[in-house]
From Swiss-Prot:
InterPro entries (alphabetical): COB_C, COBRA_pln
Gene that specifies this protein: BC1L9
Entry similarity comment: Belongs to the COBRA family.
Keyword Ion transport among record annotations: no
GO cellular component, one term: plasma membrane
PANTHER family per the UniProt record, alphabetical: COBRA-LIKE PROTEIN 4 (PTHR31673:SF3), PROTEIN COBRA (PTHR31673)
Keyword Glycoprotein annotated: yes
Protein name: COBRA-like protein 4
Glycosylation sites: N36, N163, N171, N319, N352
Keywords: Glycoprotein, Signal
Transmembrane segments: none
GO biological process: cellulose microfibril organization; plant-type cell wall cellulose biosynthetic process
Pfam family, one: COBRA
């Protein structure tokens, strides 16, 4: 048990998730300007040589989620702190605890720069707390707000045990599981307050500090990770993803390694030595993107377009759980009906021209690895808004999206002059 704070933490944690709200910060994405992951430390109780705290990671990004192998949270202690024990998460290294006194308990971690990960589902009950043990996954806030947060409890020693003697950690880092996030300094804020279930009593923690982490696709990777192709029922030509959208095929380089989909040794390569690594093994294409989205115009009449969207995974070593698309389209269009997808409109400023799509459970929410099952499909019926159309000077390519995001990453679009001619005429 957690030094007498297990029950207290469970109640306060539930209240924290209910009453917490997104913190405002500057982000990198114009479609989600306030998106961030907020890390909140709530000191619940002082201990003889430190404190017990509940740490909560809240994903306030509207359409970017974290999937297994999940988040990794790191920091640097400012004094000689140790982690006596943890619940709901674990430090990946114990470090050198040889300075522990004989006969005393050995700390969970003595690292100056600890890195913490979530526990897996099915972890022992006595190591769990509320909202833990999801293999590091954090759902996007718009897609599944109930699963957009994770928590763990940490018992810290050799740290001081008062507001005056505790030094907040520094140099926070968040991997998800790769790079891309930049974290702020820890800022001491007003202690979190919670209401009792009956709403008649308010309590507050002893001390709270926040860290805000924002994402940059540029920091995460040097090349894009998805691309868009366009096609139409009344044109035989498919406008494919631009060549080298996500890199160029080069069998002599590591980043350009790929395997042909009809290679006779395909299965042995997929299940070879690199099977358990997170290095991508892509199907050879002209664009070399791990994910391809095809926007196909199935039908058009005076008032509507009917569109089929196909999302194809071209990575043999990764599937995508809780994937999502964000589609920004021309203001003259209005989505009226959707099949196979859940959807939510995203208001960007005063213009409502962006929609978030994700797969309906349990049929389309998992995008399998490259192969016969490595795609998901859905259909849209889009109504033309003639009032907006009359004020729009350039309706060229209006049946096609302006921008497409996959799991929060901006996908490479074909150039406008390459759109199917019959639609742009």
């Amino acid at each position: 048990m957690a030094i007498g704070v297990g029950g207290c933490c469970a109640v306060l944690l539930a209240a924290a998730l209910l009453f917490s709200s997104p913190a405002t910060t500057y982000a990198y994405d114009s479609l989600d300007p306030n998106g961030n992951i907020t890390i909140k430390w709530d000191v619940m109780q002082w201990t003889p040589d430190g404190y017990a705290a509940v740490v909560t990671l809240s994903n306030y990004q509207q359409f970017r989620h974290i999937q297994p192998p999940g988040w990794q949270l790191g920091w640097t202690w400012q004094q000689k702190e140790v982690i006596w024990s943890m619940y709901g998460a674990q430090a990946i290294e114990q470090g050198d605890c040889s300075m522990s006194k004989e006969g005393s308990n050995v700390p969970h971690s003595c690292k100056k720069h600890p890195t913490v990960v979530d526990l897996l589902p099915g972890a022992p009950i006595d190591l769990q707390i509320a909202n833990c043990c999801k293999a590091g996954s954090l759902s996007a806030f718009s897609q599944d707000p109930a699963n957009s947060a994770a928590s763990f409890q940490i018992i810290v020693g050799h740290s001081g045990n008062s507001n005056e003697t505790v030094r907040v950690p520094k140099n926070f880092s968040l991997m998800a599981p790769g790079p891309g996030y930049t974290c702020s300094r820890a800022m001491i804020v007003k202690p979190s307050r919670f209401l009792s279930p009956d709403g008649r009593r308010a309590t507050q923690v002893l001390m709270t500090w926040n860290v805000i982490c924002t994402y940059s696709q540029f920091l995460a990777q040097k090349v894009p990770s998805c691309c868009v192709s366009l096609s139409s029922f009344d044109n035989d030509k498919t406008v494919d993803c631009p060549t080298c959208s996500c890199g160029c095929r080069n069998e002599k380089s590591t980043t350009g390694k790929c395997v042909k989909k009809n290679a006779p040794d395909l299965q042995s390569i997929i299940h070879g030595p690199g099977r358990w690594t997170w290095q991508p093994l892509l199907q050879c294409t002209s664009h070399m993107c791990p994910v391809k989205i095809n926007w196909h115009l199935m039908l058009k009449d005076k008032e509507h377009y009917r569109v089929k969207i196909t999302v194809t995974n071209l990575n043999y070593r990764m599937n995508f759980t809780e994937w999502n698309l964000v589609v920004q389209y021309h203001p003259i269009l209005d989505i009226t009906q959707i099949s196979g997808f859940n959807y939510k409109s995203i208001q960007v400023g005063k213009i409502n021209d962006t929609t978030m799509l994700w797969g309906v459970k349990p049929y389309y929410d998992l995008l399998m690895q490259a192969g016969p099952l490595g795609n998901v499909q859905g259909e849209l019926i889009v109504r033309k808004d003639f009032r907006a159309s009359s004020t729009t000077n350039n309706n060229k390519g209006r049946a096609f999206p302006v921008r497409v995001y996959f799991n929060g990453d901006n996908c490479v679009m074909p150039p406008p002059d390459a759109y199917p001619v019959s639609i742009t005429a």
